[in-house]
């Protein structure tokens, strides 16, 4: 059984959102409408499973913007493959991802 078969709707939606260019937790919450108590644990699981990567923003950039440093999320190669499989499995996800890319 492939990872995309085991991917929850929430995880698929978050992967699709990251794949569409939303990079930070707050942006992902805003784009999906999911609460932080759903998004952040899912991000940790996706990173643990190797589907996404994260990197902290440079302190100087955050300081210049007068806010705390943010964690930037990107799809891994495995995450891209899994997202493509999820898009085939969840037709609505395809519509959401395509709409977000426009």
Q: Language-model segments: what does each one mean?
A:
Residues 39-51:
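Basic amphipathic alpha-helical segments that dock to polyanions
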Residues 49-66, 74:
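Beta-hairpin "wing" of winged helix-turn-helix
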Residues 69:
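Exposed loop/turn and edge beta-strand positions of beta-sandwich/beta-sheet ligand-binding modules
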Residues 78-102:
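Amphipathic alpha-helical dimerization/coiled-coil segments
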Residues 2-40:
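N-terminal helix-turn-helix DNA-binding core of bacterial DNA-binding proteins
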Residues 1, 73:
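A positively charged, amphipathic N-terminal helix/segment that binds anionic biomolecules
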């Amino acid at each position: 059984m492939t990872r995309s078969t085991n991917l929850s709707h929430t995880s698929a939606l978050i992967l699709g959102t990251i794949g569409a260019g939303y990079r930070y937790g707050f942006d992902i919450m805003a784009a999906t409408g999911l609460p932080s108590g759903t998004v952040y644990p899912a991000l940790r699981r996706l990173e643990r499973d190797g589907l996404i990567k994260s990197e902290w923003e440079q302190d100087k950039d955050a300081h210049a913007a007068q806010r705390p440093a943010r964690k930037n999320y990107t799809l891994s190669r495995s995450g891209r493959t899994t997202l493509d499989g999820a898009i085939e499995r969840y037709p609505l996800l395809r519509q959401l991802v395509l709409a977000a890319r426009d």
